[in-house]
Each structure stands twice: as C-alpha cells, then as structure tokens.
Regions:
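Gly/Ser/Thr-rich active-site loops/lids in small-molecule metabolic enzymes
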Residues: 13-17, 21, 88-94, 123-153
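Active-site glycine-rich loop that binds ribose-phosphate moieties when present
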Residues: 49-53, 84-101
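Conserved phosphate/anionic-ligand binding catalytic regions in large, soluble enzymes, centered on
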Residues: 1-7, 105-125, 185-193
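C-terminal edge-of-domain segments
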Residues: 59-69, 172-193
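Flexible, glycine/charged-enriched surface loops at secondary-structure junctions
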Residues: 26-39, 101-113, 138-149, 163-178
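Structural signal for hydrophobic packing residues in well-ordered secondary-structure cores
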Residues: 17-29, 59, 71, 95-106, ...
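A generic, well-ordered mixed alpha/beta core segment in the N-terminal half of proteins
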Residues: 1-61, 68-70
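Active-site-proximal helix-loop elements at catalytic-domain edges
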Residues: 62-91, 156-157
Length: 193
C-alpha cells in the first residue's frame, strides 16, 4: 500500500478485500471450492465464500496499491514447518531433514519458500511472501549466485531434487520446481527458519 494512497468509501481496506474475495468465490464461473471454516476448534462451519481472507500489508512509498492473491489448498499450510535453530545450525541440513517427512501431502513437485531471520512470525511471513516471486531457478543457475540467499537456493534445489521424492511422492527427479529464500536481520542468539 503506497503511503499516498487514498481509499474512498466507508469500509476498511480489509472489508473491501473480503468483499472482493466473497464476490469471486460466489461468482457462477468460479471453479475453486470454499474451504474456510469459522470456529476452527468448535463447529468448524464453512463460511461458503472463503472469508475472512488472510491479509498482510506492507506500507511503502508511492501512490499505488498492489494486491497479490494466492488461492491455495490446505496442503501447503499443513506441511509448513518452523524451527528456531541455533545460530551455528545448518539451514540446508534442517530442510533436507524436513522435506522427506512431508510426504506427498504438499503435492510435489512444488516450490519451497524459506524465510530466515527476524522473529518466528517474520520468518514464516518471509517464507510465504517469497513464494509470490516467479519461478526463475534456471536463470539463477545460468548467471550464478550473487549472495548467500541465492547460494542456498541453488544448493537446496539440487539437494532436495536429489532426494528422489518426485511427483506426488512416487519417486523421480523433480521434487521442487524452485526454492525461494528470503532473509531478514535477527537477534544474535537465534536463527528462526
């Protein structure tokens, strides 16, 4: 959201976004199912329109509003992992330990989004946001890494695919189509991933 953006109307931006989601999922040509449940630890009643949406904001300079939408199933969330590693622990080793445990529930081949640093919450958000970037691992392979995050991307892409998990966990050469890594400064005592 640009700092100079003015939104007209009597609704909050969240309410406007949720109205857009509601209209999209209730549109006669929509082929995506409604999967959001209210009262998740109680009645688990389907909202029938996938609202309320999970909304994250970044306030940036400018006068434009950009909205990225990710309509996704539950597998990507169900297989999410978080760890507060020791600063000396290897992110590569941790990822290579976690991916085989995920089974086929994340519907490979897919993309891995890895957030490193900040706080627990920030690391998870970095991972999710990184998945909005285009698949470009082959371009990165061609030009070579320019920083530690890109080195991690290349190393994990090679090593995760070498696990042989393959499509739908049935074995094969391609488990990930790309690996995204985003990092953020963190406290010296921690390495949230």
């Amino acid at each position: 959201v640009g700092m100079n953006v003015t939104v007209e109307g009597m609704k909050s931006l969240d309410d406007m976004i949720n109205e857009g989601v509601r209209r999209a999922y209730n549109h006669p040509e929509n082929v995506l199912r409604a999967s959001v449940l209210a009262d998740p630890d109680g009645k688990r009643a389907n909202t029938k329109d996938n609202t309320p949406a999970v909304i994250n904001y970044s306030i940036v300079p400018g006068d434009t509003l950009e909205i990225n939408v990710a309509a996704k199933g539950g597998g990507s969330e169900a297989k999410s992992k978080f760890a507060m590693l020791n600063p000396s622990d290897s992110v590569v080793d941790w990822v290579l330990e976690q991916v085989p445990k995920m089974g086929a529930g994340w519907c490979p081949p897919g993309m891995l989004g890895i957030g490193i640093g900040g706080t627990a919450e920030k690391a998870m958000l970095l991972a999710k946001e990184s998945l909005m970037d285009p698949i470009d691992i082959h371009e990165l392979q061609a030009r070579g890494p320019q920083n530690r995050s890109e080195e991690l991307r290349l190393e994990l892409f090679e090593k995760v695919n070498a696990l042989g998990i393959g499509a739908q966990g049935l074995g094969g050469l391609t488990t990930v189509l790309d690996v995204k890594v985003a990092d953020y400064p963190t406290h010296a005592a921690n390495k949230p991933v």
